[in-house]
Amino acid sequence: MIYAYIRVSTDKQTVENQRFEINRFAKQRDFQIDVWVEETVSGTRSAKDRKLGVLLKRIKKGDTLIVSEISRLGRRLMEVMSILNACMLKNVILLTVKEKYELGNNIQSQILAFAFSLSAQIE
């Protein structure tokens, strides 16, 4: 299954830009998104208190999760690292549109995931 996750922080923001970017990204790679998960919630809220938490329980080995950028997963470093770790442990591939990275269950992915989540926190 290929999942796309979209998060905006306020009602004043729209999901359309992220949806467009993810659709374009998927089309370039000849992917078909099976499930879209969208929510309007602060990235500082715990993943378990968001639709993302349900999605993380649902995904399984071989699935792919696409986000527009790593900061859509969360704003706190430890939260993002926990989400990335959960994906890696399940052998789920995480693709980021903005950064153009493929994060899997390998050491290079773990290093990149740490660096990106740190930069998202600094922003």
Task: Give names to the regions the model predicted.
Residues 1-123:
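Short, structured surface patches at the beginning of a domain
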